[in-house]
Swiss-Prot record:
Gene source species: Burkholderia ambifaria (strain ATCC BAA-244 / DSM 16087 / CCUG 44356 / LMG 19182 / AMMD) (Burkholderia cepacia (strain AMMD))
Reaction it catalyzes: (S)-dihydroorotate + a quinone = orotate + a quinol
CDD domains: DHOD_2_like
Obligatory cofactor(s): FMN
Name of the molecule in the record: Dihydroorotate dehydrogenase (quinone)
Subcellular location: Cell membrane
Name of encoding gene: pyrD
Length: 345
Protein backbone atom coordinates (compact mmCIF):
# COMPACT_ATOMS: atom_id res chain seq x y z
CA UNK A 1 0.00 0.00 0.00
CA UNK A 2 2.68 2.49 1.05
CA UNK A 3 4.67 1.69 -2.09
CA UNK A 4 1.84 2.91 -4.29
CA UNK A 5 1.30 6.05 -2.19
CA UNK A 6 4.96 7.01 -1.94
CA UNK A 7 5.25 8.90 -5.27
CA UNK A 8 2.48 11.22 -4.07
CA UNK A 9 4.04 11.59 -0.63
CA UNK A 10 7.45 12.26 -2.15
CA UNK A 11 6.15 15.19 -4.18
CA UNK A 12 5.10 16.89 -0.95
CA UNK A 13 8.17 15.83 1.04
CA UNK A 14 10.56 17.14 -1.62
CA UNK A 15 8.99 20.60 -1.30
CA UNK A 16 10.13 20.67 2.33
CA UNK A 17 13.58 21.18 3.81
CA UNK A 18 15.39 17.84 3.46
CA UNK A 19 15.94 17.31 7.18
CA UNK A 20 12.40 18.38 8.10
CA UNK A 21 11.05 15.88 5.57
CA UNK A 22 13.33 13.22 7.04
CA UNK A 23 12.01 13.81 10.57
CA UNK A 24 8.37 13.91 9.41
CA UNK A 25 8.76 10.57 7.63
CA UNK A 26 10.40 8.97 10.66
CA UNK A 27 7.67 10.24 12.98
CA UNK A 28 5.01 8.81 10.66
CA UNK A 29 6.77 5.45 10.46
CA UNK A 30 7.31 5.43 14.21
CA UNK A 31 3.62 6.10 14.81
CA UNK A 32 2.65 3.40 12.31
CA UNK A 33 4.82 0.92 14.16
CA UNK A 34 3.41 1.82 17.58
CA UNK A 35 -0.25 1.78 16.55
CA UNK A 36 -0.21 -1.34 14.41
CA UNK A 37 -0.87 0.65 11.24
CA UNK A 38 2.39 -0.78 9.95
CA UNK A 39 0.51 -3.99 9.19
CA UNK A 40 -1.64 -2.07 6.71
CA UNK A 41 1.47 -0.57 5.13
CA UNK A 42 3.26 -3.89 4.83
CA UNK A 43 4.95 -4.40 1.50
CA UNK A 44 4.63 -7.66 -0.39
CA UNK A 45 8.22 -8.71 -0.84
CA UNK A 46 9.08 -12.33 -1.64
CA UNK A 47 11.29 -14.29 0.71
CA UNK A 48 14.78 -14.90 -0.63
CA UNK A 49 16.68 -16.28 2.37
CA UNK A 50 20.44 -15.91 2.57
CA UNK A 51 22.82 -16.88 5.38
CA UNK A 52 25.68 -14.46 6.09
CA UNK A 53 27.73 -14.01 9.30
CA UNK A 54 25.94 -17.08 10.63
CA UNK A 55 22.64 -15.17 10.45
CA UNK A 56 19.72 -16.06 8.18
CA UNK A 57 18.34 -13.01 6.40
CA UNK A 58 14.77 -13.06 5.09
CA UNK A 59 16.11 -11.43 1.93
CA UNK A 60 19.46 -9.81 1.06
CA UNK A 61 18.20 -6.19 0.81
CA UNK A 62 18.59 -4.12 3.97
CA UNK A 63 18.18 -0.57 5.18
CA UNK A 64 21.47 1.25 5.73
CA UNK A 65 22.22 3.11 8.95
CA UNK A 66 21.59 6.83 9.07
CA UNK A 67 17.90 6.94 8.28
CA UNK A 68 16.83 6.03 11.83
CA UNK A 69 19.68 7.19 14.05
CA UNK A 70 17.91 6.57 17.36
CA UNK A 71 16.08 3.33 16.54
CA UNK A 72 12.75 5.09 17.00
CA UNK A 73 10.93 3.72 13.94
CA UNK A 74 12.16 0.13 13.68
CA UNK A 75 8.73 -1.50 13.46
CA UNK A 76 7.48 0.92 10.81
CA UNK A 77 10.61 0.47 8.72
CA UNK A 78 10.44 -3.31 9.09
CA UNK A 79 7.00 -3.31 7.45
CA UNK A 80 8.47 -2.04 4.18
CA UNK A 81 9.95 -5.38 3.12
CA UNK A 82 13.60 -5.07 4.11
CA UNK A 83 15.45 -8.29 4.82
CA UNK A 84 17.29 -6.55 7.64
CA UNK A 85 17.34 -3.16 9.35
CA UNK A 86 20.39 -1.21 10.53
CA UNK A 87 19.89 1.73 12.89
CA UNK A 88 22.30 4.35 14.27
CA UNK A 89 24.95 5.69 14.27
CA UNK A 90 24.74 6.06 18.05
CA UNK A 91 27.36 7.51 20.40
CA UNK A 92 27.91 7.07 24.15
CA UNK A 93 26.47 10.49 25.03
CA UNK A 94 23.73 12.50 23.32
CA UNK A 95 25.00 15.11 20.88
CA UNK A 96 23.27 17.62 18.57
CA UNK A 97 25.47 17.07 15.53
CA UNK A 98 26.51 19.89 13.24
CA UNK A 99 24.56 23.16 12.79
CA UNK A 100 21.64 23.24 10.35
CA UNK A 101 21.17 23.29 7.44
CA UNK A 102 23.13 20.06 7.11
CA UNK A 103 21.23 17.94 4.55
CA UNK A 104 20.81 18.86 0.89
CA UNK A 105 19.12 17.21 -2.08
CA UNK A 106 20.73 17.16 -5.53
CA UNK A 107 17.79 15.73 -7.52
CA UNK A 108 19.49 16.28 -10.89
CA UNK A 109 22.07 13.69 -9.78
CA UNK A 110 19.80 11.48 -7.64
CA UNK A 111 22.03 12.40 -4.73
CA UNK A 112 22.17 13.81 -1.21
CA UNK A 113 24.85 15.69 0.69
CA UNK A 114 24.76 15.49 4.46
CA UNK A 115 26.95 16.75 7.27
CA UNK A 116 24.72 15.59 10.11
CA UNK A 117 27.59 14.74 12.46
CA UNK A 118 26.21 11.72 14.36
CA UNK A 119 23.29 13.65 15.87
CA UNK A 120 21.57 11.25 18.28
CA UNK A 121 20.04 10.94 21.75
CA UNK A 122 22.81 8.73 23.13
CA UNK A 123 23.21 5.01 23.58
CA UNK A 124 21.01 4.69 26.69
CA UNK A 125 17.93 6.07 24.90
CA UNK A 126 18.89 4.09 21.79
CA UNK A 127 18.85 0.83 23.74
CA UNK A 128 15.44 1.68 25.24
CA UNK A 129 14.05 2.26 21.75
CA UNK A 130 15.50 -1.01 20.46
CA UNK A 131 14.06 -2.92 23.41
CA UNK A 132 10.63 -1.39 22.80
CA UNK A 133 10.52 -2.56 19.17
CA UNK A 134 8.52 -5.69 18.34
CA UNK A 135 10.60 -6.49 15.26
CA UNK A 136 12.37 -9.84 15.56
CA UNK A 137 14.22 -9.91 12.27
CA UNK A 138 17.91 -9.19 11.70
CA UNK A 139 18.78 -5.88 13.38
CA UNK A 140 22.16 -4.20 12.98
CA UNK A 141 23.18 -1.59 15.56
CA UNK A 142 25.68 0.98 14.29
CA UNK A 143 28.06 2.63 16.79
CA UNK A 144 30.43 5.60 16.65
CA UNK A 145 32.33 8.06 18.81
CA UNK A 146 31.29 11.40 20.27
CA UNK A 147 32.58 14.46 18.44
CA UNK A 148 34.37 15.77 21.54
CA UNK A 149 36.16 12.50 22.27
CA UNK A 150 39.82 12.86 21.18
CA UNK A 151 40.64 10.52 18.33
CA UNK A 152 43.34 8.94 20.51
CA UNK A 153 40.58 7.80 22.89
CA UNK A 154 38.06 6.74 20.23
CA UNK A 155 38.34 3.08 21.20
CA UNK A 156 36.84 3.89 24.61
CA UNK A 157 33.65 5.17 22.97
CA UNK A 158 33.35 2.15 20.67
CA UNK A 159 33.95 -0.29 23.52
CA UNK A 160 31.38 1.46 25.71
CA UNK A 161 28.74 1.39 22.98
CA UNK A 162 29.53 -2.21 22.08
CA UNK A 163 28.93 -3.30 25.66
CA UNK A 164 25.62 -1.42 25.84
CA UNK A 165 24.13 -2.60 22.54
CA UNK A 166 25.56 -6.12 22.42
CA UNK A 167 22.65 -8.00 24.06
CA UNK A 168 20.12 -6.48 21.66
CA UNK A 169 21.94 -6.69 18.31
CA UNK A 170 21.93 -9.29 15.56
CA UNK A 171 25.21 -7.69 14.49
CA UNK A 172 27.09 -4.51 15.45
CA UNK A 173 28.58 -2.11 12.90
CA UNK A 174 31.72 -0.15 13.73
CA UNK A 175 31.40 3.14 11.84
CA UNK A 176 34.85 4.67 11.28
CA UNK A 177 34.09 6.22 7.90
CA UNK A 178 31.72 9.15 8.36
CA UNK A 179 33.36 12.28 6.91
CA UNK A 180 31.37 14.49 9.29
CA UNK A 181 33.19 13.73 12.56
CA UNK A 182 36.61 15.36 12.67
CA UNK A 183 39.52 12.94 12.13
CA UNK A 184 37.25 9.87 12.30
CA UNK A 185 38.56 8.45 9.04
CA UNK A 186 42.05 8.35 10.54
CA UNK A 187 40.87 5.14 12.20
CA UNK A 188 41.01 3.47 8.77
CA UNK A 189 44.81 3.77 8.86
CA UNK A 190 46.63 0.47 9.27
CA UNK A 191 48.02 1.04 12.77
CA UNK A 192 44.93 2.74 14.16
CA UNK A 193 42.59 0.12 12.70
CA UNK A 194 44.71 -2.75 13.97
CA UNK A 195 44.60 -1.42 17.53
CA UNK A 196 40.88 -0.65 17.41
CA UNK A 197 39.86 -4.03 16.02
CA UNK A 198 42.09 -5.87 18.49
CA UNK A 199 40.34 -4.12 21.37
CA UNK A 200 36.88 -4.72 19.91
CA UNK A 201 37.48 -8.42 19.24
CA UNK A 202 38.73 -8.90 22.79
CA UNK A 203 35.61 -7.16 24.10
CA UNK A 204 33.39 -9.18 21.76
CA UNK A 205 34.75 -12.45 23.13
CA UNK A 206 34.25 -11.38 26.73
CA UNK A 207 30.69 -10.26 25.96
CA UNK A 208 30.03 -13.54 24.14
CA UNK A 209 31.09 -15.45 27.25
CA UNK A 210 28.89 -13.22 29.43
CA UNK A 211 25.76 -13.37 27.27
CA UNK A 212 26.15 -16.84 25.79
CA UNK A 213 26.07 -15.68 22.17
CA UNK A 214 28.57 -14.33 19.66
CA UNK A 215 27.27 -11.16 18.00
CA UNK A 216 29.11 -10.52 14.70
CA UNK A 217 31.02 -7.30 14.10
CA UNK A 218 30.92 -5.42 10.78
CA UNK A 219 33.28 -2.58 9.85
CA UNK A 220 31.92 0.30 7.73
CA UNK A 221 34.50 1.86 5.41
CA UNK A 222 34.72 4.83 3.05
CA UNK A 223 34.79 4.84 -0.77
CA UNK A 224 37.67 7.34 -0.79
CA UNK A 225 40.44 4.74 -0.46
CA UNK A 226 43.40 3.96 -2.68
CA UNK A 227 44.50 0.44 -3.58
CA UNK A 228 47.06 0.24 -0.78
CA UNK A 229 44.51 1.33 1.81
CA UNK A 230 42.01 -1.26 0.61
CA UNK A 231 44.69 -3.95 0.83
CA UNK A 232 45.68 -2.89 4.35
CA UNK A 233 42.07 -2.87 5.49
CA UNK A 234 41.50 -6.31 3.97
CA UNK A 235 44.59 -7.71 5.69
CA UNK A 236 43.49 -6.24 9.02
CA UNK A 237 39.97 -7.64 8.70
CA UNK A 238 41.38 -11.10 8.02
CA UNK A 239 43.91 -10.90 10.84
CA UNK A 240 41.27 -10.05 13.42
CA UNK A 241 38.58 -12.32 11.97
CA UNK A 242 36.04 -9.52 11.63
CA UNK A 243 32.75 -11.06 10.56
CA UNK A 244 31.76 -8.57 7.82
CA UNK A 245 32.57 -5.27 6.14
CA UNK A 246 30.13 -2.64 4.85
CA UNK A 247 31.33 -0.91 1.68
CA UNK A 248 30.79 1.98 1.47
CA UNK A 249 29.89 5.15 3.31
CA UNK A 250 29.51 8.55 1.60
CA UNK A 251 32.19 10.19 -0.54
CA UNK A 252 33.97 13.54 -0.31
CA UNK A 253 34.42 13.65 -4.08
CA UNK A 254 32.32 16.13 -6.05
CA UNK A 255 33.53 15.14 -9.52
CA UNK A 256 30.10 13.84 -10.58
CA UNK A 257 28.08 16.81 -9.33
CA UNK A 258 30.20 19.84 -10.25
CA UNK A 259 28.10 22.89 -11.06
CA UNK A 260 24.88 21.58 -9.51
CA UNK A 261 23.06 23.50 -6.76
CA UNK A 262 24.44 22.54 -3.32
CA UNK A 263 27.38 20.67 -4.87
CA UNK A 264 29.85 22.79 -2.89
CA UNK A 265 28.23 22.09 0.47
CA UNK A 266 30.52 20.33 2.92
CA UNK A 267 29.68 16.77 3.90
CA UNK A 268 29.34 13.30 2.47
CA UNK A 269 27.80 12.76 -0.96
CA UNK A 270 25.53 9.72 -1.36
CA UNK A 271 23.33 8.35 -4.10
CA UNK A 272 23.94 7.58 -7.74
CA UNK A 273 27.31 9.43 -7.96
CA UNK A 274 28.92 7.06 -5.43
CA UNK A 275 27.79 3.86 -7.20
CA UNK A 276 30.90 3.22 -9.28
CA UNK A 277 33.38 4.16 -6.55
CA UNK A 278 31.60 1.90 -4.08
CA UNK A 279 31.60 -0.99 -6.55
CA UNK A 280 35.31 -0.55 -7.19
CA UNK A 281 36.07 -0.78 -3.47
CA UNK A 282 33.86 -3.88 -3.23
CA UNK A 283 35.69 -5.54 -6.13
CA UNK A 284 39.14 -4.77 -4.73
CA UNK A 285 38.20 -5.75 -1.21
CA UNK A 286 36.65 -9.01 -2.38
CA UNK A 287 39.89 -9.81 -4.20
CA UNK A 288 41.71 -9.39 -0.86
CA UNK A 289 39.36 -11.21 1.52
CA UNK A 290 37.43 -13.63 -0.71
CA UNK A 291 34.61 -15.36 1.14
CA UNK A 292 36.34 -15.08 4.52
CA UNK A 293 34.83 -11.64 5.19
CA UNK A 294 31.36 -11.13 3.69
CA UNK A 295 30.78 -7.71 2.13
CA UNK A 296 27.57 -5.72 2.53
CA UNK A 297 27.38 -3.45 -0.51
CA UNK A 298 25.86 0.02 -0.19
CA UNK A 299 26.08 3.14 -2.31
CA UNK A 300 23.99 4.34 -5.23
CA UNK A 301 21.48 1.51 -5.63
CA UNK A 302 18.46 2.86 -7.54
CA UNK A 303 17.24 -0.28 -9.33
CA UNK A 304 17.19 -4.04 -9.17
CA UNK A 305 19.97 -4.11 -11.73
CA UNK A 306 22.10 -1.89 -9.48
CA UNK A 307 21.66 -4.37 -6.64
CA UNK A 308 22.62 -7.22 -8.93
CA UNK A 309 25.79 -5.36 -9.99
CA UNK A 310 26.77 -4.92 -6.33
CA UNK A 311 26.50 -8.67 -5.77
CA UNK A 312 28.44 -9.38 -8.96
CA UNK A 313 31.21 -7.12 -7.64
CA UNK A 314 31.52 -9.33 -4.56
CA UNK A 315 28.84 -8.30 -2.07
CA UNK A 316 26.80 -10.92 -0.23
CA UNK A 317 24.09 -8.47 0.88
CA UNK A 318 23.11 -4.93 -0.09
CA UNK A 319 21.71 -1.91 1.72
CA UNK A 320 19.62 1.03 0.55
CA UNK A 321 19.56 4.63 1.72
CA UNK A 322 19.47 7.46 -0.83
CA UNK A 323 17.79 5.33 -3.49
CA UNK A 324 15.12 4.45 -0.94
CA UNK A 325 14.53 8.16 -0.23
CA UNK A 326 14.15 8.92 -3.94
CA UNK A 327 12.22 5.82 -5.01
CA UNK A 328 10.49 4.61 -1.86
CA UNK A 329 9.57 1.07 -0.76
CA UNK A 330 8.99 -0.15 -4.33
CA UNK A 331 12.78 -0.24 -4.68
CA UNK A 332 13.06 -2.91 -1.97
CA UNK A 333 10.81 -5.38 -3.79
CA UNK A 334 12.44 -4.59 -7.13
CA UNK A 335 15.90 -5.37 -5.75
CA UNK A 336 14.82 -8.58 -4.05
CA UNK A 337 13.12 -9.84 -7.21
CA UNK A 338 16.12 -8.97 -9.40
CA UNK A 339 18.49 -10.83 -7.09
CA UNK A 340 16.15 -13.83 -6.89
CA UNK A 341 15.92 -13.98 -10.71
CA UNK A 342 19.71 -13.86 -10.96
CA UNK A 343 20.10 -16.79 -8.59
CA UNK A 344 17.58 -18.95 -10.47
CA UNK A 345 18.83 -18.05 -13.95
Amino acid sequence: MFSSLYPLARASLFKMDAEDAHHLTLRALGAAGRTGLACALSARVPDAPRTVMGLTFRNPVGLAAGLDKDGAAIDGLASLGFGFIEVGTVTPRPQPGNPRPRMFRLPQADALINRMGFNNHGVDQFVKNVQAARYRGILGLNIGKNADTPIERAAEDYLYCLERVYPFASYVTINISSPNTKNLRQLQGAGELDALLAALKDKQQRLADLHGKLVPLALKIAPDLDDEQVKEIGDTLLRHKIEAVIATNTTLSRAAVQGLPHADEAGGLSGRPVFDASNEVIRKLHAEVGSAVPIIGVGGIFSGEDARVKLAAGASLVQLYTGFIYRGPALVAECVKAIARERTA
